């Protein structure tokens, strides 16, 4: 199972680096920062489906 450590999030701003991750909501996030901010917003219900685009 793929996991991402989001313990140091949320961050107020994310970089524009492109390293896509696919969330359990079937949405592609541009990078870990965007994904982790979404995880925090979802109260932990969002998880990583896999690395790369959905």
From Swiss-Prot:
It comes from the Eukaryota. Glycans are attached at residue 43. The record marks 16-17 as: Reactive bond 3. One of its GO terms (molecular function) is serine-type endopeptidase inhibitor activity. The keyword Repeat applies. Disulfide bonds join 6-36, 14-33, 22-54. It is found in: Secreted. CDD domains: KAZAL_FS (cd00104). Avian ovomucoid consists of three homologous, tandem Kazal family inhibitory domains. PANTHER family: OVOMUCOID-LIKE-RELATED, SERINE PEPTIDASE INHIBITOR, KAZAL TYPE 2, TANDEM DUPLICATE 1-RELATED. This is Ovomucoid. It comes from Anser anser anser (Western greylag goose).
């Amino acid at each position: 199972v793929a996991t991402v450590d989001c313990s140091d999030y949320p961050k107020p701003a994310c970089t524009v680096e492109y390293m896509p991750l696919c969330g359990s909501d079937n949405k592609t996030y541009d990078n870990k920062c965007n994904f982790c901010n979404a995880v925090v917003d979802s109260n932990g219900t969002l998880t990583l489906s896999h690395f790369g685009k959905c």
